[in-house]
């Protein structure tokens, strides 16, 4: 097994660590999958604990950051950094430890992009905060922000990089399919975080 394959496997396994679930148990909240949307990500954890939600967001982001860091240590290929990020996100979405039922990948995406292009993270957060302040839908804000960053990657990176990022974006949008259906039917819950 070559080093690229090792990094990809490690990226998936790191991404698979279910910090939202672990922190919820440590914090005495029990199984977060039985609360709200049933998701293990920061948004669902927020419904029970703001502090644990922040910790979940940061740790899920670190998963992406570490995966890209490993890619950059062992390869100078920029596209490989995107691939490692994608496998970390896949791990977060489909963790082997939880029968492949995980989160939606936004925090892990942001963490991975910190080392690829931090300015895109700033753009993502600006758009997310703006849309959330207006509509109060975390899912809508995440989807639109991800699409915008995909356009930035297309404008400033190679076609190979863009292809990988589009694949990541499609995975993220697919993970939000239930949210999209609820928004279209007017049944999506708004989230109040003080914005």
Curated annotation (Swiss-Prot):
Q: What subcellular locations does the record give?
A: Cell inner membrane
Relate the assembly described in the record.
Probably interacts with PlsX.
Tell me the organism: Ehrlichia chaffeensis (strain ATCC CRL-10679 / Arkansas)
Mainly localized where?
membrane
Q: What reaction does this enzyme carry out catalytically?
A: an acyl phosphate + sn-glycerol 3-phosphate = a 1-acyl-sn-glycero-3-phosphate + phosphate
Task: Describe the task this protein carries out.
Answer: Catalyzes the transfer of an acyl group from acyl-phosphate (acyl-PO(4)) to glycerol-3-phosphate (G3P) to form lysophosphatidic acid (LPA). This enzyme utilizes acyl-phosphate as fatty acyl donor, but not acyl-CoA or acyl-ACP.
GO CC, sorted alphabetically, is:
plasma membrane
The name this protein goes by in its record: Glycerol-3-phosphate acyltransferase
Q: Do you know which NCBIfam families this protein is assigned to? A: glycerol-3-phosphate 1-O-acyltransferase PlsY (TIGR00023)
What topology does the record note for this protein and the membrane? Answer: Multi-pass membrane protein
Q: What is its EC number?
A: 2.3.1.275
- Gene symbol here is plsY
* Similarity field: Belongs to the PlsY family.
Which InterPro entries does the UniProt entry name for this protein?
G3P_acylTferase_PlsY
- Protein's pathway: Lipid metabolism; phospholipid metabolism
């Amino acid at each position: 097994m070559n080093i690229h394959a090792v990094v990809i496997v490690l990226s998936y396994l790191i991404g698979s660590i279910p910090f939202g679930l672990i922190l919820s148990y440590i914090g005495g909240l029990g199984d977060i999958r039985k609360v709200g949307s049933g998701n293990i990500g920061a948004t669902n954890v927020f419904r029970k604990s703001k502090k644990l939600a922040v910790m979940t967001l940061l740790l899920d982001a670190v998963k992406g950051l570490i995966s890209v860091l490993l890619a950059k240590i062992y390869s100078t290929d920029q596209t490989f950094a995107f691939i490692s990020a994608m496998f970390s996100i896949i791990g977060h979405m489909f963790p082997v430890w939880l029968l492949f039922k995980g989160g939606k990948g936004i925090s892990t995406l942001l963490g991975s992009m910190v080392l690829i292009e931090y300015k895109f993270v700033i753009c993502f957060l600006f758009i997310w905060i703006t849309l959330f302040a207006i509509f109060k839908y975390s899912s809508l804000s995440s989807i639109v922000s991800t699409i915008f960053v995909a356009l930035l990657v297309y404008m400033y990176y190679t076609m190979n990089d863009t292809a990988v990022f589009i694949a990541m974006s499609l995975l993220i949008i697919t993970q939000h399919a239930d949210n999209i259906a609820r928004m279209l039917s007017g049944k999506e819950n708004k989230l109040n975080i003080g914005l």
